[in-house]
Amino acid sequence: MPKRVLQGVVVSDKTDKTIVVKVERRFTHPVMKKTVRRSKNYHAHDEANTAKVGQTVFIEESRPYSKTKTWKLVEDQAAAAEAAGTAA
């Protein structure tokens, strides 16, 4: 089974090697037919402390690092865009 990958925005990087990522999902309400926005915060492991508040990042399911931290940072979009820009 493949690991889930989510995209979100870093809302906190105050703790060592941990970031809090807000992931927003949208769906259509079954009765009202209105688009509803819901968000959830995920604690993710950031080994190198590279992610900063406001960055858009990808997180991936992983082994439990602690009671609440079961996701890890895959890459941040700013670093990926910078690497693509220097490679091109």
UniProtKB/Swiss-Prot annotation:
CDD domains the UniProt entry points to: Ribosomal_uS17
SUPFAM superfamilies in the record: Nucleic acid-binding proteins (SSF50249)
Example GO molecular function: structural constituent of ribosome
Pfam families: Ribosomal_S17
Similarity field: Belongs to the universal ribosomal protein uS17 family.
Quaternary structure note: Part of the 30S ribosomal subunit.
Protein name: Small ribosomal subunit protein uS17
Organism of derivation: Methylorubrum populi (strain ATCC BAA-705 / NCIMB 13946 / BJ001)
